[in-house]
Amino acid sequence: MKMTVDFEECLKDSPRFRAALEEVEGDVAELELKLDKLVKLCIAMIDTGKAFCVANKQFMNGIRDLAQYSSNDAVVETSLTKFSDSLQEMINFHTILFDQTQRSIKAQLQNFVKEDLRKFKDAKKQFEKVSEEKENALVKNAQVQRNKQHEVEEAANILTATRKCFRHIALDYVLQINVLQSKRRSEILKSMLSFMYAHLAFFHQGYDLFSELGPYMKDLGAQLDRLVVDAAKEKREMEQKHSTIQQKDFSSDDSKLEYNVDAANGIVMEGYLFKRASNAFKTWNRRWFSIQNNQLVYQKKFKDSPTVVVEDLRLCTVKHCEDIERRFCFEVVSPTKSCMLQADSEKLRQAWIKAVQTSIATAYREKGDESEKLDKKSSPSTGSLDSGNESKEKLLKGESALQRVQCIPGNTSCCDCGLADPRWASINLGITLCIECSGIHRSLGVHFSKVRSLTLDTWEPELLKLMCELGNDVINRVYEAKLEKMGVKKPQPGQRQEKEAYIRAKYVERKFVDKYSALLSPSEQEKRIISKSCEDQRLSHARASVHTPVKSNDSGIQQCSEDGRESLPSTVSANSLYEPEGERQESSVFLDSKHLNPGLQLYRASYEKNLPKMAEALAHGADVNWANSDENQATPLIQAVLGGSLVTCEFLLQNGANVNQRDVQGRGPLHHATVLGHTGQVCLFLKRGANQHATDEEGKDPLSIAVEAANADIVTLLRLARMNEEMRESEGLYGQPGDETYQDIFRDFSQMASNNPEKLNRFQQDSQKF
């Protein structure tokens, strides 16, 4: 340490010492002014940056509004949406930069000024005070008369004590000066280095973002050239069509008599009809009617949602009405109601009656139930009913979930009664159900079965992957293991009371599960597992290919295997050193189920990503929050994190796993996912209410761990979740459930973790580079 004030001169209290003190004190005063000024400028810069981010967000909202307005133009909508999302990501990077600037410059330098400079000032005051006391003692000692021996001794004693106190305080003051002079260099350089690293991360993230966007921008430039050519071509075609229509003869209404049961848009016939109201006045109103997808619907205005008159034409009849005063009337009669309609002419009436009759005959010949596909809304066509973008998106989501789940073995029929084409599912069991069985499952309570529609509800990607990992065949092998032995027959469709009794016995009482017996202790099971793994190592691969489904990883669905189950790639974790004590086996090796503890089975299967074994363990009464005392009180959910499987975590959470249960080191699932860099799992746990403020035995919370690891994605998720939590607390009980930006970003991360996990490997790739 380089001393700026000499201790020897301090003891002498020489003029050189006083001059050095004066120089140092002036330098410290000037340093304080400079630091105060820098902190104020930093605060102003941060405030200006936050205002910039707010204005930029408003600008992004304007771009999104323009994209929504251009929803009919796929190129414009896609481009604007992609650009706004990228710019929104840059705003998030700016927000992180300003936060790091506040911590590196403002917080550190303010702490230096308030703590270290304050100690210097306190030491200075004490030094000045004792210096004054020393001067007074010297003067008093010099003034005392020699003949007054008592006063001479008293003055000498006071002078000695004062000198001793002065030397002590002066040495402390010099030490404080030297420490301050040395520390200020490290504090200033440390804060500036942290500030520069924040900028480095900011520009690195921006470079990565726009590197991905660059090829798309080049393609868009090429599309713009083609758009100019296509626009000129469309203009010429419209001019030709305009001339053709002007020359057409409109004297005949034969075009209104046409109907087509095989129309591509699903509309058999459409046109205006008068409809008699069902009120007391029996008024007649003119409405636009159409026959489509085995339904008769009408609407008043183009933007109105269509009203369904007949939900299923197979249940109705059509007939002429000659007993009323108005002409050209006909009636559509269903089991619950009838509808009186009037055409504009006799030809139109006959055409409508024939169209309805033909649609009824066609509906009986069709095998599929086409009515559910439109969800009571029509397909868009020129001059037809408007289904709306929202219904189309919902339809696509429903069809996608239905098709992907039903391709799993056994899922084409109800898991409990065998009725074909089930449209409901139990997400914690991983099975498909008919509508009647789904109602019975719902009555059991969510702790037994969580029911969701395969066509009406929106499915998260991780939940859809979970359904594709299980299926009716897998679950029934567990919950119906003793069905034939007990001589019990499954209920048939339509038997409500028999179904209810059977489902309650199957899932609540678990009567048909092959119970375990002669359970071993966890430590004994561990020994047998290891010994059995050595014996069966030669056959483990063959058994796994027959009995064990493809292991899931923190990645997306790649392809459908031969049995219809969605196959996921199996990778070795890059953090293989971060495992509980004891060597892990590469494939699942279990004891005979008759001697296996369900809790340990669930624990091991969670690490091995073996969902069928996990479901079997839960069926045999395994506690989903079971803690392994031999491995630091780790839980199955923590094991799922160590195994790197997003789907396994989702399965445990759906079955009641505690997302905040911690091991002996004070680390919960969120801690472990952060340490391992599993971004998808971090996103999942935050959505399920994980406490990110919890600290482990080292006093570290997940955010501090992510910051130390420089994992930008996880840091972003944790800080957004924390900001959203603070916003909700500030808004009180009636606040919004979450910021829109927060929800959008978490939705994007969920989609990325399930479908494009390679994009979340930026942290590991960057670590390998350095």
UniProtKB/Swiss-Prot annotation:
GO terms for cellular component: endosome membrane; plasma membrane; ruffle. It comes from Mus musculus (Mouse). The modification Phosphotyrosine is found at residue 734. Signal peptide: none annotated. GTPase-activating protein (GAP) for ADP ribosylation factor 6 (ARF6). Doesn't show GAP activity for RAB35. ANK repeats lie at residues 632-661, 665-694, 698-727. Residues 379-388, 550-561 have a biased composition (Polar residues). It is found in: Endosome membrane; Cell membrane. The modification Phosphoserine is found at residues 384, 387, 521, 573, 576, 767. GAP activity stimulated by phosphatidylinositol 4,5-bisphosphate (PIP2) and phosphatidic acid. This is Arf-GAP with coiled-coil, ANK repeat and PH domain-containing protein 2. It holds the Pfam family BAR_3. GO terms for biological process: actin filament-based process; cellular response to nerve growth factor stimulus; endocytic recycling. Residues 1-226 form the BAR domain. Residues 266-361 form the PH domain. The keyword Zinc applies. GO terms for molecular function: GTPase activator activity; phosphatidylinositol-3,5-bisphosphate binding; small GTPase binding; zinc ion binding. It is a peripheral membrane protein. A zinc finger (C4-type) spans 414-437. Keywords: ANK repeat, Cell membrane, Coiled coil, Endosome, GTPase activation, Membrane, Metal-binding, Phosphoprotein, Repeat, Zinc, Zinc-finger. Residues 399-520 form the Arf-GAP domain. Interacts with RAB35 (GTP-bound form); the interaction is direct and probably recruits ACAP2 to membranes. Interacts with MICALL1; the interaction is indirect through RAB35. The ANK domains are required for interaction with RAB35. The lineage of its organism: Eukaryota, Metazoa, Chordata, Craniata, Vertebrata.
